[in-house]
Amino acid sequence: MADVSRSSSLYTEEDPLQAYSGLSLFPRTLKSLSNPLPPSYQSEDLQQTHTLLQSMPFEIQSEHQEQAKAILEDVDVDVQLNPIPNKRERRPGLDRKRKSFSLHLTTSQPPPVAPSFDPSKYPRSEDFFAAYDKFELANREWQKQTGSSVIDIQENPPSRRPRRPGIPGRKRRPFKESFTDSYFTDVINLEASEKEIPIASEQSLESATAAHVTTVDREVDDSTVDTDKDLNNVLKDLLACSREELEGDGAIKLLEERLQIKSFNIEKFSIPEFQDVRKMNLKASGSNPPNRKSLSDIQNILKGTNRVAVRKNSHSPSPQTIKHFSSPNPPVDQFSFPDIHNLLPGDQQPSEVNVQPIAKDIPNTSPTNVGTVDVASPFNDSVVKRSGEDDSHIHSGIHRSHLSRDGNPDICVMDSISNRSSAMLQKNVDMRTKGKEVDVPMSESGANRNTGDRENDAEINEETDNLERLAECASKEVTRPFTVEEDSIPYQQGASSKSPNRAPEQYNTMGGSLEHAEHNQGLHEEENVNTGSASGLQVENAPEVHKYSHKQTNKRRKRGSSDSNVKKRSKTVHGETGGDKQMKTLPHESRAKKQTKGKSNEREEKKPKKTLTHEGKLFSCRKSLAAAGTKIEGGVRRSTRIKSRPLEYWRGERFLYGRIHESLTTVIGIKYASPGEGKRDSRASKVKSFVSDEYKKLVDFAALH
């Protein structure tokens, strides 16, 4: 403790700045340390600080003192401050005046002399060309500085490019016009000489056309001038005329006189009468439009599609159909038919046509004239056999409804029923055998064998005779078969099932393709069946037909796609002797319809699937653009593109090109350098082939170069 107190006492004695505060330690105040120190103080009052500063000596320059006085006195005095020593000053002008800028050339000083070149100083060619290059550079620079290269262009134009020297010994002839004024004088002299010496027709034609060139031009010019004058005169005359003179035909007569127009009489004109163009009587809407022969081109294009309209020319419709056709209000449901119970005796349904009077008028009803069968009824086509108490009296009627494109029902005679020449029609004969429905294809002979009753045979023969007559009429016109959609059928099916005298109808049509026709002809040669009947019947003869059905079904499986079309588009002809039997077979036939429709739908669904799979195979076989330049190796797709490092062409590395197929040249190999075994610097060139060994010679030949 004694040591600490001793050191502190020493510190207080030896420290000379202990009595000064921080403000008194500036460098200026340190100069005054030689003066005696003021008494020490410990307080920090502001007043003591001021007194301390005032007592201390202050050295100040005279300039600073004057500035301080001026600021304090607030006197406007220009204080001369010393300039900044590092400030850049302008160079003195050496007591010369600055020249004013002017665009005029100074004539006081002579222009600089252009550089010259003396070739005699350079005997050596190397020195000569080096000096000449320097001279050109100096001359260009001098021209840029003086501007003589721009000003003297007009005075000294650049020399023209010399032409290529021609072949020695040849002199170019000056150009001369081949067609001159003397040509016309020669032509006139030739015309005069033609009278004495005849020339060829072609030469005379050319000379005549050349001679009349100028005259025709003059005539055209004269005519245009004359027409302009005439038009101006006509306009002046029209403006000079009064209103009374121009009323009526006055202006027209004036124009006819001045322009020399021939007047014509309208009464003398007669318009020719065209046979194919006829007037339309819009008031007579209740009557049928008159028969009109269509144009030959349209008739060829629409052959077979408008056969109903063509058939109207040969058969006049019944009065019932006329009323139905001319009705301004068509029925709401175009496919519905009135019930047969609501008809009065003697009335006839609009879709029913009696065939017997028509069949009597048809000539030449021989069975050999029957053509190919194409049943083209779009909605309903059936033959209904009605029998009463007297079996001898058979009334057969044909029911058919046809709807035209514009929505009006058009009723006409049934197109065709049977085919006698093919002698075979595939019918859907619904049989009830042991509680099962069987679809049996039957020929006319098979139908006649299976019908046990002779009365039924007589009825069938009598009915088929009537059908043959209708088939002969239908065979005269070329028709096109078409398939009826099943969605448009149920309205008629429901209406026909209500009436007891109508058998249920199946809405299937026969296909008229060439394959089906050839198939029918082959069947006709195999089975020489009885030609006395021409329709298939639905017969309830279970045991006999069941045996026959197995044979026919086996044949049908072998026939392929032709019979499938027949089965889809087959037509059923129902013949029964009593109304009770018809009512009994109604549920059985409805089940058969569902079965046949289901089969046809299955076949129609299978066909587009086959076509789709075939198109899919073709599409899958096509090369994919995404897989271009790749191949599959070991289940992994790898690139077939040629990959190489940057080739060193200065060492002889390069790609080898060649034509290995009928296209452009392709890369067939690569030639690269590889380090040798012994020396490091030496590299041997190697060849790598990208093609098969078949083109090895081609690769080696390309690697030699």
Curated annotation (Swiss-Prot):
InterPro entries the record matches: CENP-C/Mif2/cnp3
This protein's UniProt keywords: Cell cycle, Cell division, Centromere, Chromosome, Kinetochore, Mitosis, Nucleus
A cellular-component GO term for this protein: nucleus
UniProt biased composition (Basic and acidic residues): 429-439, 466-479, 515-527, 573-592, 599-615
Extent of motif Nuclear localization signal 1: 86-93
Keyword Nucleus: yes
Motif Nuclear localization signal 2 in this chain: 159-166
GO molecular function: centromeric DNA binding
GO biological process, one term: cell division
Biased composition (Polar residues): 315-327, 490-511, 529-538
MIF2 homology domain II: region residues: 636-658
Residue numbers covered by motif Nuclear localization signal 3: 556-563
Organism domain of life: Eukaryota
Locations listed in the record: Chromosome, Centromere; Chromosome, Centromere, Kinetochore; Nucleus
Primary localisation category: nucleus
Biased composition (Basic residues): 160-174, 548-559
Residue span of motif Nuclear localization signal 4: 592-599
Disordered, as annotated region: 146-175, 311-351, 386-408, 423-615
Domain remarks in the Swiss-Prot or TrEMBL record: The MIF2 homology domain II targets centromeres and binds the alpha satellite DNA in vivo.
Assembly description: Oligomer. Component of the CENPA-NAC complex.
Family: Belongs to the CENP-C/MIF2 family.
Name of the protein in its database record: Centromere protein C
Species: Arabidopsis thaliana
Gene: CENPC
